[in-house]
């Protein structure tokens, strides 16, 4: 069909059923901008007298509405006049509404000499795709409202992610909706890019309008803003949930500490514990020792200690007895003697090792005998130390 044929066809459809340029372009698969440029001249005079919207009731000038009430017999005449005016206005409005209903009915009941756009129940993937004609010859219109349809696959993916992260019921619901919306938005973005690419391939050289690249850039900007908003929403939900979890843990910990302190005081009374033992019990169970108990422990540590286990062996001043001191002294002396004997034995072993390995004994370091040196006479100013010789070699030597 040429544009002249389109002009005649659009003029007839617009005159019979109130067709718009956008509906005509979508039905006949035309470029909306090009169709609007060629068919705009036929839009102004296509409406009939019945299809035009009724004019609003003209309000009378203020001077003509002034009523002389000098001859009114009753005060109710003013109210009756107002009621009559309201009834007249309501009648005009009712007539306009009825006229609009008749107009819509004529549009819906238009003649069947042209194709009608039909929409069938399809899956999300099919609804996001723009089909030309199916097997039955029906045309499916592509609308932006298809993106708002709930995506079952996106919901399942969101639930799987939330099960791995761990969340409560309220947070799960909010994050599930946000994540599914994010996944559907990404799916819609990819589908729009593919559709624009197909449109660019099908676009003719003489068609003018918005370039496909500009549409892709505009769509990507919108998707980026929406994705950033959804990410911020998910991040804020997670932060709020973690904050509430920390507050709940602090509250539970404070309540648990109160129970631990109460249990420690009960055990202290039952088992006759000291304050220090009660404090150890509280710390062992992860509690915090109360300030009063800390002050009592400090006071007990500052007080002088007295040993009253054996009062018979204690002096008047509380010092240990002489028998205890003598016993302690004997034990320390025996310990010192044992340490001295052990030290002497260790030193002898070190000296013997030095003599044997350094060549100062009967055999030098190379295994040669030192008898020649031992048989030499002493110098005039040297004397033999018999005591040392006896200790080293014995009496037989």
Swiss-Prot record:
Keywords: DNA-binding, Hydrolase, Nuclease. GO terms for molecular function: DNA binding; nuclease activity. Residues 43-62, 304-325, 356-397 are annotated as: Disordered. Residues 374-387 have a biased composition (Acidic residues). It comes from the Viruses. Residues 43-53, 388-397 have a biased composition (Basic and acidic residues). Necessary for recognition and cleavage of the phage packaging site (pac), together with the pacB protein. Both are probably the two major subunits of the phage PACase. Multimer of two distinct subunits. This is Terminase A protein.
């Amino acid at each position: 069909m040429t544009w002249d044929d389109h002009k005649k066809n659009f003029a007839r459809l617009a005159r019979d059923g109130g067709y718009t340029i956008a509906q005509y372009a979508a039905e006949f698969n035309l470029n909306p901008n090009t169709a609007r440029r060629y068919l705009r001249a036929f839009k102004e005079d296509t409406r009939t007298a019945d299809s035009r919207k009724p004019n609003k009731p003209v309000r009378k000038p203020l001077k003509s509405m002034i009523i002389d009430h000098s001859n009114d017999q009753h005060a109710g005449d003013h109210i009756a006049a107002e009621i009559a005016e309201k009834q007249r206005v309501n009648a005009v409005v009712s007539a306009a509404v009825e006229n609009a209903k008749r107009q819509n009915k004529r549009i819906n009941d238009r003649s069947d000499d042209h194709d009608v756009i039909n929409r069938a129940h399809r899956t999300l993937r099919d609804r996001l795709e723009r089909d030309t004609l199916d097997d039955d010859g029906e045309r499916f219109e592509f609308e932006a409202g298809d993106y708002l349809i709930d995506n079952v696959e996106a919901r399942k993916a969101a639930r799987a992610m939330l099960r791995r992260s761990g969340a409560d019921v309220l947070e799960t619901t909010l994050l599930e909706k946000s994540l599914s919306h994010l996944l559907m938005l990404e799916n819609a973005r990819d589908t729009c890019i593919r559709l624009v690419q197909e449109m660019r391939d099908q676009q003719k050289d003489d068609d003018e309008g918005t370039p496909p690249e500009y549409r892709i850039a505009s769509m990507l900007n919108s998707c980026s803003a929406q994705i950033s908003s959804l990410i911020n929403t998910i991040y804020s939900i997670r932060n709020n949930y973690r904050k509430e979890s920390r507050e709940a843990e602090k509250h539970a910990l404070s309540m648990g500490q109160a129970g631990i302190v109460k249990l420690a005081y009960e055990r202290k009374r039952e088992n006759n514990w000291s304050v220090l033992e009660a404090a150890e019990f509280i710390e062992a169970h992860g509690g915090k020792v109360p300030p009063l108990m800390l002050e009592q422990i400090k006071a007990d540590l500052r007080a002088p200690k007295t040993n009253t286990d054996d009062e018979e062996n204690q002096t008047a001043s509380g010092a240990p007895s002489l028998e205890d001191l003598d016993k302690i002294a004997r034990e320390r002396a025996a310990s010192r003697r044992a340490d001295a004997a052990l030290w002497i034995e260790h030193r002898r072993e070190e000296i013997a090792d030095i003599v044997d390995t350094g060549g100062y004994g009967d055999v030098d370091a190379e295994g040669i005998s030192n008898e020649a040196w031992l048989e030499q006479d002493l110098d005039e100013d040297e004397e033999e130390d018999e005591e040392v010789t006896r200790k080293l070699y014995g009496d037989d030597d």
